[in-house]
Amino acid sequence: MKTNRMTRLSLIMSLFLMFITISSASFAQGWRAQEMEIKINIHSTDELIRLHNLKLNCDEIYTIPGATWAYVTPEELHKLNQSGLSYTVSIPDLNKRTLNTDGTLVPNGYMTCQQVDSFADSLANAYPNLVKRVYVGTSVQNRDMVTIKLSDNPGEDEAEPEIWFQCGIHGDEIGPTENGVRLARELCKKYGSDSLMTRLLNQRETYICLMVNPDGRNAMSRYNNDGIDINRDGGYMWNGEGNSPAPYTAIESKALRNFINSRHFAVCTDYHSGTIYLSFPWSYRAAQAPDFTHIESLGNVYADASGYSALPVGQGYSGMYPINGSTKDQNYGSNGSVAWSLEISELKQPPASQITYYYNQNKNGMLQLMNKAGLGIRGTVTDTAGNSIPARLRIENTMPFFNDPIKADFQKYLVPGIYKLYVEANGYESKIISDIVVDANNATYLDIKLTPDQSNAWAGKIVTSYIPNNNFSDEGATWAAIGKADNKNYSIGKYGYVIVDAIDTIINLPGSDFKVYEGDNTPEEYSVAVSTTIDGPWHTLGDATGTASFDLDGSSLNKVRYIKISDIGPGSSMAPDAGFDLDAVELLHIKARAAFASNKQTICAGDNVNFSSLSVGNPSTFEWQFEGGTPSTSNEANPQNIKFNQSGTYNVSLTVSNGFGSDQLQRESYITSLELPVVDLGNDTVVDYSQSVPLDAGAGAASYLWSTMDTTQTQLINSTILGLQGGDVWVKVTGMNGCINSDTINIHFMNWDGIGSGPEQHVIVNAYKNTNSLNISWAGQQLKQLKVYNIQGQLLELIPMNGTSNDEVKLKTKQKQIAIILVIESNERPIGHKLIW
């Protein structure tokens, strides 16, 4: 709503006044200069609100009356004095604590940063089939944010529920890291002997970040080495707390965000110490999160399984202390994961003798969390051919969540009930699945297939949002701003902004490239900037009022992924629908994305396969590669009759382009060409009509079918079966893999009665196939002529003989087999026959 107007200069000045600029040199010892720890007493909700408005670095508080510990400089203490809140100083100067003999501040009995790092290496080396070190990022001082993956196939990305545990985001809260170490070690040691732990490693992918803030642990400081509270630096509803001058200022925050955004975690747990409480979203506002019922249910699973007599479970804002920029709000608000922070001990640094005690208090809770996180709904989102599609999903009245863009799988924890699921993906028709039944003991699996729709493309995720000083008069429905325009909107706040992830790449083509929709009937002013990365640099496209289209020509960029929409006033800052009301961002030109299908993937050697492109983004060129195929390449959109003659497994790739940029999809071992059974009945033959011919179709087949209708491996063929003249005999053999091969032989029966069984001993016939000739020698008789027959008994040649003792005969005809009959001159009595070549 519009009530007044503020110039852009005033906006910039007000933002600068909010930010606290701190040099990293001030944090050489882990804390700001002269920073002290104080205990603040809170007696009422009014005092809690006054404390929150001071934006001090405070630990959580979950009872009123109660107390919290804050970390303040002398300047901040002066502001606290003016507020009228009561406090006592517990540590006058946090930078003057005594170092250990090894030069660190980590209490004896707890692992140092180097020891944590070495532990991860040692565990991965000892259990390479269960553990893999994964890279999340490094700290300001170049320490690794030590992270391990636990799974029965740690080197593979499997379609299994993913669990995220993070420890030590506040470096001086050291117990959680010890818990993570012990959980990882016990899972490995008991794999194969403990049924639950074995199943969790077989059916889950569990990631444990043992040190989010290694510099802070090394210095026993809440902050990173630049003095930023990483748990106030998150981008979802960031508000300038924790010395954070802008969202994701800390290098550790960026690394954490990028890694978590690259996965699709079902549950994200952020471990702390300093009290005992399981705190779930929202922490930035009092209103319940859309998934409140589901998150609370899973939180109670942890609490009930834990060793605590009564682990409190509740919303962060009301159950503990209001904060902005927390990782739990970020992981839930942007990614839709069940997310919370979990405080495991009253003391931040309990005596080392209690490390095992607190691990045992949490172990069963962690195991049951991993176990139950697989309930609700699971499944995949693909196109009709099974190609993975990056999709956004939303159960009605809950936060959107996302599938794995590579493996296509998703997981959403839900309490038992009947649900409706909305599924959207750029370049595909949207789908609504109703009446999904979820029970208490098993996940409901959904195999979701979407049909291409080139015109359907919308921005899909809110990655950063900022409403100055919050605005609890508005519902803060960030989820309303993603997906298709539907007149439901997120009001970004007066002088607030939002960064939208298009999920796809928007490309610069002639005309407008994307369109911003306002969701109400009161057009308001805003500015738009774009970037190829989530952190900028940002290129301004200009200002607009209400729904408007934008062209990337104004940015000097050919492609972008992120869009920053900033309200530029006027209007009230603390009213319903304050600021620009963002309904949706439509993507008018998206980068081509390759996808394809075939009419079959498993074939028998020699079969043909037909391929078709299912690519989105209106591609104009196609480049196919068919390993082992004939032909091996094609530039058609839908190549047909690609033959795979040899058995084996073959890759297929498709590269598409729509004029700007290209995309390739290679599917490994996409075509499986099965071996044909070996069948060889031998050469065609001529035999006497009284003889039988044994035939063998080869051992080891699944079935046989002969032309005689017999189904055995062997046959004995004679003139009674085939007839006096003979003929073809065929067999079809089906291999164990289902492939069929066949062979045919011609058997000719001749009546040699009166001709003899062969040439007499004194007649010798030598055949020379390469010259198609015969050498005939004899003694004692004069030969008159040579008759040449084929196997069907037809006379091919009649060759006069010279009657001498030997002769060289050149045949005119070539046949596979020729029956030769020699005739004696005196009475033309046949003296024998011989079958040659």
Task: Name each region found by the language model.
Residues 9, 22-28, 621-623, 649, ...:
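C-terminal outer-membrane/trafficking sorting elements
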Residues 104, 108, 132, 454-590:
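A domain-level signal for the mature, folded cores of soluble proteins
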Residues 157-292, 296-300, 304, 308, ...:
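Active-site/substrate-binding loop(s) of hydrolase catalytic cores
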Residues 376-384, 448, 695:
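A short, amphipathic beta-strand motif
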Residues 389-415:
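Short, acidic Ser/Thr/Gly-rich low-complexity loop/linker segments typical of extracellular
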Residues 416-427:
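A short, solvent-exposed beta-strand micro-motif common in secreted/extracellular proteins
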Residues 427-453, 749:
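Structured interaction patches on ligand/partner-binding surfaces of diverse proteins
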Residues 591-618, 630-638, 643-645, 649-766:
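Proline- and Ser/Thr-rich low-complexity, intrinsically disordered segments
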